[in-house]
Amino acid sequence: MSKSIFVVCITLLVVLSPTLNAKMVTYPNGDRHCVMAQGQVISACLQQANGLPHADCCYAINDVNRYVETIYGRLALCKCFQEILKDSRFTKLIGMPEKCAIPNAVPFDPKTDCDRFVEHIWLKMF
């Protein structure tokens, strides 16, 4: 199963990168690239029915958030997903972290001010 997900992610990476003008943004902790995070979430979440996320979608969102260990990483991830949410093909992703009930997840909302989101997370840490 994980091998097929990997193949799907790589395929999406190759196909969607030029289409989305995706930026290869490295998270500050060096664990992932923006395009790979986008591909992982897109491949897992766009098959949902009626706007309700399924377990694979929630797992993918949790997974990309889990690898971001710093405030700067959260900012990069937030901006990373801002890029694809501007595209009408990916509006189904809006609000998915909340629907999956993932605490402190980077919001998927094109109206999110990523700097304010990170500031809010920073304040919760202290």
Curated annotation (Swiss-Prot):
Domain of life: Eukaryota
Disulfide cysteine pairs (residue numbers): 34-80, 45-57, 58-100, 78-114
Position of the signal peptide: 1-22
Keywords: Disulfide bond, Lipid-binding, Signal, Transport
GO molecular function, one term: lipid binding
SUPFAM superfamilies, alphabetized: Bifunctional inhibitor/lipid-transfer protein/seed storage 2S albumin
Protein task: Plant non-specific lipid-transfer proteins transfer phospholipids as well as galactolipids across membranes. May play a role in wax or cutin deposition in the cell walls of expanding epidermal cells and certain secretory tissues.
Family from the record: Belongs to the plant LTP family.
Name listed for the protein in its UniProt record: Non-specific lipid-transfer protein 15
Gene name for this UniProt entry: LTP15
